[in-house]
Amino acid sequence: MEHLFINTDIPPEVNAEFRVYSDDEMKRLNAEITQMDVQIARCLLIHQMLGTRISDTLTLRPDCLTRENGQDMIEIYQVKTKRYKKPISKELAKLLQSSIEYTQEKFGDTEYIFVNEKEPDRPMQYMAIKTKVMSMIQEKQLKDDHGELFGFGTHMFRHYYGVKLTEMHLDDWTIARLLGHKRLNNVQHYRKMSNQRMADETREV
């Protein structure tokens, strides 16, 4: 699977600055994302709701959905490690099913849900998505909480998801499993960011 992407397709997992979108920033960004191409919008919303790495989202397979004891589940193939399952909401399952049906109707049977339109045997490419989102941000003059044009990186959706998990008071092992981490040390980054957000909000009050 690692041969499906070139180096520029996938953003680095670790960045010098561990930033996370605020709730208001997410609302503004998603309001515009939902007006984009329908399959790109679905891909980005699913990516946010899963909290996966972008490579894992882009290589989701049409048979990834299952039900176990009445609970919707998704099977995720990780480029870096292995495959694993996690529970998902009914709303997310419906969004995934719509994405699967869209691709099947347009391209027939494919290996991936989100495909490259010119080469549907390959997954949708990250840089193509980023280019379109950045163009949208420029066109709409979409600004963050500091009055600056939005920066965009899909890792920030994962940061947002991870921080939200820590705010639910889940234990480190559960958070690591939901994020697809094999080790616990990465969870501390999300806890640190959650504490920083709380401190920032307190200062604003």
Language model region names:
Residues 1, 46-47, 74, 93-100, ...:
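Short, structured motif recognition centered on aromatic/hydrophobic residues
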Residues 1-30, 75-81, 114-123:
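Flexible interdomain linker/hinge and immediately adjacent N-terminus
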Residues 20-54, 158:
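Basic, Lys/Arg- and aromatic-enriched nucleic-acid-binding interface segment
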Residues 40, 146-168:
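Short basic/aromatic active-site micro-motif
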Residues 47-68:
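Short, charged phosphate-coordinating catalytic segments
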Residues 57-58, 162, 169-181:
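Active-site-proximal segment of tyrosine recombinases
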Residues 68, 77-123, 132-136:
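Basic, alpha-helical nucleic-acid-contacting "clamp/cap" segments
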Residues 78-82, 179-204:
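Catalytic-site neighborhood detector that most strongly recognizes the C-terminal catalytic loop/helix
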